[in-house]
């Protein structure tokens, strides 16, 4: 049998019950502070962690480092869908594949299109560690990517904000939203060290 001493004493002593209620008016309605904190911790622990733009750029930087280890120019890219799911990630593979078009951006676009069985990726975002060259900028436009995030600018070989500025050409039929500068210092440092070691 369950013994409910507190309930019994309140029933037999109304005055005492009133005094207890005045001391802790919400004691029967709300959990203690410790229990509340515990419940909040449980809720937070079970909440899905949403990747950030920095998270995706850091993955692209990891791909750039892996490319450098293969003696490729350290450029990496990550392509994600509209819900933040990673569809593809890669670094430059021009040397490994003896393919001058195997830039990181081209690699992830090819992989994502193959994965989806589609030639266009209108809900997707591309994260890349260097401003895309004219070839890659054109591929980004053809793939109809929604957003482009790039880390470091490329005044010599870029095709977005430098050089031919592909997205501003009258023959360009799609221009993604542009977000430069995320991870710029890290990306620039990778490139600087890579080329200094080879001079």
Question: How would you name each of these model-derived features?
Answer:
Residues 5-27, 32-33:
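Low-acidity, Ser/Thr- and Arg-rich intrinsically disordered low-complexity segments
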Residues 118-130:
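Immediate flanking context of iron-sulfur cluster ligation sites
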């Amino acid at each position: 049998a369950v013994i409910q001493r507190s309930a019994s004493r309140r029933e037999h002593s109304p005055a005492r019950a009133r005094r207890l209620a005045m001391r802790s008016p919400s004691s029967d309605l709300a959990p203690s502070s410790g229990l509340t904190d515990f419940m909040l911790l449980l809720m937070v622990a079970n909440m899905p962690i949403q990747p950030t733009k920095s998270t995706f750029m850091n993955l692209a930087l990891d791909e750039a480092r892996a490319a450098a280890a293969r003696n490729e120019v350290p450029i990496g890219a990550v392509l994600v869908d509209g819900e933040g799911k990673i569809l593809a990630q890669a670094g430059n593979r021009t040397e490994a594949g003896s393919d001058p078009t195997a830039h990181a951006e081209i690699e992830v676009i090819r992989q994502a299109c193959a994965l989806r069985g589609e030639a266009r990726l209108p809900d997707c975002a591309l994260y890349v560690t260097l401003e895309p060259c004219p070839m890659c900028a054109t591929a980004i436009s053809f793939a109809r990517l929604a957003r482009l995030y790039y880390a470091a600018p490329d005044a010599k070989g870029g095709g977005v904000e430098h050089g031919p500025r592909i997205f501003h050409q009258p023959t360009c039929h799609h221009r993604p939203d542009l977000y430069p500068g995320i991870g710029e210092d890290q990306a620039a440092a990778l490139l600087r060290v890579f080329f200094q070691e080879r001079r």
